[in-house]
Amino acid sequence: MNEIYLLVGGEATRLQPLSSGVPKALLTIRGERIIDKIIKQFSNFDNFNFNLICSIKHEELWIDYKTNHNNNVNLLFEKSKLDTAGYIVENLNSMPDKFYCMNGDLLLNVDLPNFINASSLCSNSLIGSFEVEDPTRFGVLEVGQDDKVVQFVEKPKDKSYGNKISLGLYHLHKKDILEIRKNLEIPCSFERQVFPMMSKARLLSTYTVNGDMLDVGTLESYISAHIVKGEDNWISPNNVEISKSAIIKNSVILDNCIVEDNVTITNSIISSNSIISKDTIISQEIIRKS
């Protein structure tokens, strides 16, 4: 049985008020929670125990999720902000010898079975990567000929360091983290502390997947995640009333909403239980009205 630790403590601050007080992983895409999409994707390929590293301020929401939606997850709560790697480093002695770790608020469109197979063949920790056209917008993994990560370069000026960036999915060996642990202080980040130290010690390899990932933490990406090719909008099938005179373009309408006469909605998200009054014009906004 594989162990996977999903980092689900973050909130989508740029999606407020839709996301106010809610971890990003519990937001829905086309009616399905992001965390459920991730769990389903991994469960299709292998046997996993799902361990969710949560913020204590979301304790009530996560207990409700486990009780009413998915009893087959283990909830692990951070009592304070530990950054992306802090909980794992702090509790390293109780971790298995090898385990997967992933940012629990990403949508992956990748050859996941190949990554899992590559991780089983790799003798040290492995970070998933994918290629982008413009690496100057990202933190780049400079990779050697042996697929070892040489260094992390933040927003390089050109492609001289390559064009591979982190997928947010890792297979970690406890022995590798133990080698660098004395140099780590908690809170600590995988991206800023753990992985750069591991790469200097030649303890980190990469596997480049086919495909990409989507972080749905912005207005544009949240809308994009909902609308598939051939569609103009995504409108929830759950108790939504829209006037025939309303105009809606490239937008998302969530559950239990009413859109009245002569409303125009463009490039926007209408949160659940909202009422949009007649003659309202909405553009590039996230709305929660009643």
What is the role of each PLM region?
Residues 100, 107, 113-120, 133-135, ...:
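Catalytic-core segments of class I nucleotidyltransferases/pyrophosphorylases
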Residues 51-55, 129, 269:
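Short internal beta-strands
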Residues 2-7, 14, 27-28, 32-114, ...:
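Conserved N-terminal catalytic core of the sugar/cofactor nucleotidyltransferase
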Residues 28, 49, 129, 142, ...:
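Short, well-ordered beta-strand micro-motif
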Residues 26, 141-143, 195, 206:
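A structural signal for short hydrophobic beta-strand segments in well-ordered beta-sheet cores
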Residues 126-143:
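Short beta-strand-to-loop element that shapes/binds the nucleotide-sugar donor at the catalytic cleft/hinge
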Residues 234-290:
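Structural signal for interior beta-strand "rungs" in well-ordered beta-sheet cores
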